[in-house]
């Protein structure tokens, strides 16, 4: 009797093992059909459409008016609005950097609860630099400000796109507002701020210029610090542009 019980027990365990092996094998076969790389934990990313370099002219150069952010009334922290004024004036407007600064939404550098301002939401601090320090502002508030002057349909915020798209706009006759760094190359002085919407990394080295041209080796730009068609080698300039989030705005004269 004991041998019979042992035999039945062994038979049961063998049957159970076979069933489990079949189930596991079937499960992974189905999973493999759905996910070609089972071990990957990275989410699927849709590749960005970008302009091919081969589709661009070898070089392009635009004559964009130069504005100096330190012309009185000076804007010590006003590189973003000064660059935007250059962009708008290129299409024939007489808007000034100070008018744009007056109409740009702003927040304190630090609020009463100790939270830092967020440049994605507004200009952080004092754009003039007369009353208090300031950091700057990112593409969102600048694009919204531009729309007030030229209309929604004439503003293209291409933030996140490849730099070849910036070059394509220049080749098409449209200068481009961008965020870069003061050295026009990557920097290592980022700090983390706690804002009301979460933590962000910022650098006081942020800067804004207008891309006016390019050729095989260099990018040309109007610098609101006072230089027209300044140049920088492509590699460093593009690396700084990407480090700052590939922020870019262009306008159309429809």
Q: Language model features by range: what are they?
A:
Residues 83, 159, 180-184, 213-215, ...:
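A mature extracytoplasmic/lumenal domain signature
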């Amino acid at each position: 009797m004991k041998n019979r019980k042992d035999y039945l027990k062994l038979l049961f365990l063998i049957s159970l093992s076979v069933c489990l092996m079949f189930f596991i094998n079937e499960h992974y076969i189905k999973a493999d059909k759905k996910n070609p790389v089972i071990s990957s934990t990275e989410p699927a990313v849709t590749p960005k459409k970008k302009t091919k370099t081969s589709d661009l002219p070898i070089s392009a150069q635009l004559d964009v008016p130069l504005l100096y952010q330190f012309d009185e009334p000076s804007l010590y922290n006003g590189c973003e609005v000064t660059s935007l004024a250059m962009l708008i004036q290129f299409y024939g407007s007489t808007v000034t950097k100070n008018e744009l600064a007056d109409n740009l939404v702003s927040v304190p550098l630090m609020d009463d609860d100790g939270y830092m301002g967020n440049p994605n939401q507004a200009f952080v601090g004092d754009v003039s630099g007369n009353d208090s320090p300031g950091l700057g502002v990112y593409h969102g508030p600048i694009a919204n400000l531009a729309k007030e002057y030229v209309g929604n349909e004439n503003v293209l915020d291409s933030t996140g796109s490849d730099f070849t798209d910036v070059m394509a706009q220049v080749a098409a006759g449209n200068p481009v507002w961008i965020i870069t760094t003061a050295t026009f190359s990557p920097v290592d002085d980022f700090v983390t701020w706690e804002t009301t919407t979460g933590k962000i990394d910022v650098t006081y080295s942020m800067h804004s210029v207008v891309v006016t041209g390019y050729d095989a080796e260099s990018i040309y730009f109007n610098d609101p610090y006072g230089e027209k068609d300044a140049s920088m080698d492509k590699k460093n300039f593009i690396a700084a542009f990407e480090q700052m989030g590939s922020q870019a705005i262009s306008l159309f004269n429809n």
